[in-house]
From Swiss-Prot:
This is Maturase K. PANTHER family: MATURASE K. GO terms for biological process: mRNA processing; RNA splicing; tRNA processing. One of its GO terms (molecular function) is RNA binding. Keywords: Chloroplast, mRNA processing, Plastid, RNA-binding, tRNA processing. Usually encoded in the trnK tRNA gene intron. Probably assists in splicing its own and other chloroplast group II introns.
Length: 522
């Protein structure tokens, strides 16, 4: 355990003190309002009741004054817990809600500063060619294809949640030495509204992703997940004496700016990267006998060893977890399965090993014999049932997959309705371009196409058949434009188009930096 502590302290040697005084500087809130450092983080501006953006600077100055006054500041935080729909408190809530959000955003900027400096220093010391390619979610599947086919066992690990607030404060304390800032964070997190269910399961606490706390939530969650990665890295280093140069290629994904850039939350309907609860954050390492991948709150650990070896990994991880975080880790969160008989649901794909056997007849002089060869291939399939469940939750079809209209879109123009449905279909096709059987997407396309027709018919008080006849060619062009035709405009013309026409070819893209909404909604 002392060795683990020394390993962690070595990585945290560059702590940043004296961040609390910056909380009283106006430019910190200007950074928060302007998407933070270099605009790399997702941010949604605040709407204050009865005020425009021009008056926000005056409100920020008033906020700084109230922070100096302890009693006044306490009332600001407590007022944010009041019901925003109470009419006689309408204006007071406008102030309180704005103050609470600005404090949250300003604090997020402050705690991000040490990690942004660390990331810049990391890239200055170590240049990684084409590191931008590693940012794609799809980049992890070629890694899995090359590794899982030679491994025997796989463990699914769920990172524990919810997390007690004091654990998050202790994690920040490891990186930040500024005691006043830590006390401020503890006070704010315990007083602010909705934090009693912080880091609950994403399907039970979608309201946590409010405009007021989204940025700070993502930062704290990533700091927590980063500590989990420390434990896996420590076990990896102690389980093998082989030093892998490829490990560094993936390590930069741990840094917060790279993570949080992918952690955008486009809709409350879903994201997340997991339980991220946030989007497409990937991390992995490989050894001669083990490989591990993490996305959001799910970790996949595969090994070529025995079932006993996987159990040792499991109990070592559980013991280190309980020692480091000081709370119980339920062992049932880790499932060990034989890879040959297991389908792994990961990043919107059902992945399993497909055994291919081939027989070769070998003739040597007068003797002939048969050679049987068995190879394992990673098969990635589209989970149609899960996608239909997502479409059902989003009210595009029934639970059984029967298309229905989308009433809330009926007020849009015909062009916008068709464009929205078509964009969903194209995004799904793009995200699942790595599927071994792309025909499975045809049913999803059919549901979206017929749902679009029903929505248009509902808007114009007509029949579905009428709109299918009238807009048949337009709908076909929107929903059934094959991805190969798009690729033909991108790839060199010298390659015959028949190459793109094959439905058996899996294509992994390097521009997908977040999990598809419908995939994560299931």
């Amino acid at each position: 355990m002392e060795e683990l502590q020394g390993y962690l302290e070595k990585d945290r040697s560059r702590q940043q003190p004296f961040x609390y005084p910056l909380l009283f500087q106006e430019y910190i809130y200007a950074l928060a309002h302007d998407r933070g450092l270099k605009g790399s983080l997702f941010y949604e501006p605040t709407e204050v009741f009865g005020y425009d953006s021009k008056s926000s600077l005056a409100l920020v100055k008033r906020l700084i004054i109230r922070i100096y006054q302890q009693n006044d500041f306490t009332s600001v935080v407590n007022d944010s817990n009041k019901n925003q729909f109470v009419n006689h408190h309408h204006n007071n809530f406008g102030y309180s809600h704005f103050y609470s959000q600005m404090i949250s955003e300003g604090f997020a900027i402050l705690v991000e500063i040490p990690f942004s400096l660390r990331l810049v220093s990391y890239f200055e010391k170590k240049e990684i060619p084409k590191s931008h390619n590693l940012r794609s979610i799809h980049s992890i599947f070629p890694f899995l294809e090359g590794k899982l086919x030679h491994l025997n066992y796989v463990s699914d690990i769920l990172i524990p949640h919810p997390v007690h607030m004091e654990i998050l404060i202790q994690i920040l304390q490891c990186w930040i030495q500024d005691a006043p800032l830590l006390h401020f964070x503890r006070f704010f997190l315990h007083k602010x509204h909705n934090w009693b269910r912080f880091l609950x399961t994403p399907k039970e606490s979608x309201y946590v992703f409010s405009k007021x706390n989204k940025r700070l939530f993502r930062f704290l969650y990533n700091s927590y997940v980063s500590e989990c990665e420390f434990l896996l890295v420590f076990l990896r280093k102690k389980s093998s004496y082989l030093r892998l140069t490829s490990f560094g290629l993936f390590l930069e994904r741990r840094h917060f700016y790279v993570k949080m850039e992918h952690l955008q939350m486009q809709h409350l309907i879903l994201i997340v990267v997991c339980l991220d609860y946030x989007q497409g954050t990937l991390w992995s390492f490989x050894x001669x006998x083990x490989x591990x991948v993490r996305c959001q709150g799910x970790v996949v650990l595969a090994s070529k060893g025995t079932h006993l070896l996987m159990k040792k990994w499991k109990y070592n991880f559980v013991n280190l977890w309980q020692y480091h975080f000081h709370f119980w880790y339920q062992s049932y969160r880790i499932h060990i399965n034989q890879l040959s008989n297991y389908s792994l649901y990961f990043l919107g794909y059902l992945s399993s090993l497909l055994r291919n056997s081939s027989t070769v007849r070998n003739q040597m002089l007068e003797n002939s014999f048969l050679i049987d060869t068995v190879t394992n291939k990673l098969e990635t399939l589209v989970p149609v049932i899960f996608l239909i469940g997502s479409l059902s939750k989003a009210q595009f079809c029934t639970v059984s997959g029967h298309p229905i209209s989308k009433p809330i879109w009926a007020d849009l123009s015909d062009f916008e309705i068709i464009e929205r449905f078509g964009r969903m279909c194209r995004n799904l096709s793009h995200y699942h371009s790595g599927s071994s059987k792309k025909q499975e997407l045809h049913r999803i396309k059919y549901i979206l196409r017929l749902s679009c027709a029903r929505t248009l018919a509902r808007k114009h008080k007509s029949t579905v058949r009428t709109f299918l006849r009238r807009l048949g060619s337009v709908l076909l062009e929107e929903f059934f434009t094959e991805e190969e035709q798009v690729l033909s405009l991108i790839l060199p013309k010298a390659i015959p188009f028949t190459f793109y026409g094959s439905h058996k070819e899996r294509i992994w893209h390097l521009d997908i930096i977040r999990i598809n909404d419908l995939v994560n909604h299931s």
